[in-house]
């Protein structure tokens, strides 16, 4: 696998070299604490994701106006939006993010393989509330200084979502100053998905931070299962992006709890 993770890291390096993250605008973020939103929600807190492609599936949806998609997600009751800014393998861009940011008032996650402060500077400029760090990249020493990146992000007024896939990664992530921990049900070595990943990790490990579940969530039953396991929020991309009625799909999932 190293293979896929290495590719992701190299893609971020390539994007940095190609000046993808050189942003001339400066947009405000929502100013809303997603953690509070998740804690106070009476229904399922969804972070819905706008992504047109992925390494696992290739093309997910024809590239169209992200603002139209975002507005349907918000109307359906999404608590936050995740927008891909990584051009390689994900067909994302900071421009997509900024278009959406100008239209929505809810929290937004800059979804990318963050390896450098240049990307955090970009997150600040494009109006992100959160950016992503992947625990395994640091545990495998493919990227260094996680705490430094977290501290830098906090100084910029940003919050951090750390993604973990194994119990060890989860324990390591919980010890950091990150704001939210995401359990990725997808194994980044094999790209296989197992929702029991969230169950196994939360059965065995305490964490004082807000924990969300990510990847492979397709139905109301999935959300109810993950809720029972202890997940407080749910990051859902593909199942919504593939749906012909995005607003209704989001509404149904939000009302699953």
In which residue ranges do the predicted regions lie?
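Generic structural signal for hydrophobic
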Residues: 72-74, 100, 123, 149, ...
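Catalytic cores of alpha/beta
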Residues: 115-127, 166-177, 213, 217-236
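C-terminal helical cap(s) of enzyme catalytic domains, especially alpha/beta-barrels
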Residues: 195-204, 227, 242-257
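Glycine-rich phosphate-binding active-site loops on the catalytic face of alpha/beta enzymes
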Residues: 125-140, 182-191, 231-250
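Conserved N-terminal beta1-alpha1 strand-loop-helix module at the mouth
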Residues: 1-108, 115-118, 157-178, 189-196, ...
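Catalytic-face loop-and-helix region of soluble metabolic enzyme cores
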Residues: 180-228, 232-236
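Glycine-enriched alpha-helix->loop->beta-strand junction motifs that scaffold or abut catalytic
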Residues: 77-78, 103-106, 125-131, 154-158, ...
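Hydrophobic, well-ordered secondary-structure scaffolds
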Residues: 100, 108-138, 147-149, 153-156, ...
